[in-house]
Amino acid sequence: MITLSTLKKYKKEGRKFSCLTCYDAMFAKMMQNAQVDTILIGDSLGMVVQGNDSTLPVTVEDIVYHTGNVSRSNKHALILADLPFMSYVTVEDAIANTRKVMQAGAQVIKLEGGAELSEMVTTLTKAGAPICVHLGLTPQSVNVFGGYKVQGKSDDAAAKLMSDVHAVVAAGASLILLECVPASLAKAVTEAVDVPVIGIGAGADTDGQVLVMHDMLGVTHGRTARFVHDFLTDERNQKSEYAGSVEGAFALFHNSVIEGSYPQAEHQFN
């Protein structure tokens, strides 16, 4: 079974780790069979499961429901879960909603934000809830950003992100997740902190890589993000012992991350 201690050990050893989003029991079981290291019950479910155009409508009850589905069916992966939009405005809200999600089976709680989360991170960590802080492109703030855009491109923005990372790590964050930032910035962050860093659209040098399950299976509509690769139709999966199955796509993703063949330069932002 993968734990936070396992991920910290992997970081020290230079061994990459895999992460996929998941929302139900059957896919969770397949991910266990494929040895995927970590699973995120993400508020991305608002878009890929519920059909919304953003993550904002997702509720705590939604996360609790899907976390239970996953945690009952996967006993291998470390399970992360989001607190959704406006569910942790106050420390009191954060404590109450963290309790609900962890009682459903989450082992790490993910929050979106920066240094302003420091007090909350410390409080939740002291209460026994490991925290992953999500920085860079944070989908819950899409209306503030004016759309889904690469973050940390200017010197000032990069310095601000690095400062935020140091603040939340000092406050007790157990993991960092960077989304859609230049690969060079993600590399600098990963080297600057002793906690594991997960990337999505953040280059190849982070400690772990995460993708939305539907994206990496090619189950998408409209424009596909630069960092997405379709592992289901990948020739390596088609020719593998899995014979092109979904479980094979999960295994190929996991192995590609560990071996360093994903992501490639074409998947990153400069």
Swiss-Prot record:
Active site: 179
Named cofactor requirement(s): Mg(2+)
Binding residues for 3-methyl-2-oxobutanoate: 43-44, 82, 110
Binding locations of Mg(2+): 43, 82, 112
GO biological process: pantothenate biosynthetic process
InterPro entries registered for this protein in UniProt: Pantoate_hydroxy_MeTrfase, Pyrv/PenolPyrv_kinase-like_dom, Pyrv_kinase-like_dom_sf
Lineage top rank: taxon: Bacteria
Pfam family, one: Pantoate_transf
Subcellular location: Cytoplasm
Function: Catalyzes the reversible reaction in which hydroxymethyl group from 5,10-methylenetetrahydrofolate is transferred onto alpha-ketoisovalerate to form ketopantoate.
Entries under HAMAP family matching the protein: PanB
Protein family: Belongs to the PanB family.
PANTHER family found in the cross-reference section: 3-METHYL-2-OXOBUTANOATE HYDROXYMETHYLTRANSFERASE
Subunit relationships: Homodecamer; pentamer of dimers.
Protein name per Swiss-Prot or TrEMBL: 3-methyl-2-oxobutanoate hydroxymethyltransferase
Lineage of source species: Bacteria, Pseudomonadati, Pseudomonadota, Gammaproteobacteria, Moraxellales
Originating gene: panB
